[in-house]
């Protein structure tokens, strides 16, 4: 898979293009007198060092771009790489099956769990089918149905958050978008089973929160979590989306800042260059964190889970 490089990664892209050119020449003519392998090795080492240097000093806006990277692993990628025997469940039993939310039962190291997550889609047709990862009310009602099923069968719930936000269309509003989100917030706070939430890409406003109330909340290193997109914030405050980088810094959308504010519990490190550079390694790290979180929560009674979750929610904000 050829990588898509973001604007701030262009120096890396130029090196990788040179490596690809030399590799192609080497394949075409293996009888060349010059030692291309040594040059390729040197350029690869230089590319790694340059990547380390660039990624050691990323700003909030650059991280926001990484969170939206088109090759970043989505929910179903992690389901494939970190879980076994996934059986997808569909529909809200009231209106429709929203493809922007996927969910079902799977096994995590042999243990049955309920998985729920946003799914954006990659190719144009799939993006449209998934509504670019923006759920309608029926998506959140499907998620709630699966959560209630998990509670009945005493299965832990694992959610993956990756959405620009809930769908703002007229039809979604007419079908009760705000009510569906609010109901999920209320019901998730009352669930009697462990709930572990992880932001794997974009965590956009209420659309993210509707599956984001949990006992443990994690973020991948280059994910973002905010009440509005940087572009939206900039358009409101400065009347120009061009101020998005400034807004991103001011909003505190990145994992270290949110951990400092005690809004999340853990930051899961990503492979050098981001999760899309090595999805298998990212899935292994994510799986290890999920297993550790469930081990911590397994020792708690139902009442302890509910009380801890309540105290967590009440700790947010400033008096």
UniProtKB/Swiss-Prot annotation:
**Which pathway, per its entry?**
Lipid metabolism; malonyl-CoA biosynthesis; malonyl-CoA from acetyl-CoA: step 1/1
Main subcellular localisation = cytoplasm
Q: Enumerate the catalysed reactions.
A: N(6)-carboxybiotinyl-L-lysyl-[protein] + acetyl-CoA = N(6)-biotinyl-L-lysyl-[protein] + malonyl-CoA
Q: Name one GO biological process term.
A: malonyl-CoA biosynthetic process
Q: Where is the CoA carboxyltransferase C-terminal domain?
A: 35-296
Where is it found, in Gene Ontology cellular component terms?
Answer: acetyl-CoA carboxylase complex
Q: Which SUPFAM superfamilies does the protein's record reference?
A: ClpP/crotonase
Instruction: Indicate the quaternary assembly.
Output: Acetyl-CoA carboxylase is a heterohexamer composed of biotin carboxyl carrier protein (AccB), biotin carboxylase (AccC) and two subunits each of ACCase subunit alpha (AccA) and ACCase subunit beta (AccD).
- The identity of this protein, by name, is Acetyl-coenzyme A carboxylase carboxyl transferase subunit alpha
What species was this sequence derived from?
A: Shigella boydii serotype 4 (strain Sb227)
> What gene is this protein a product of?
accA
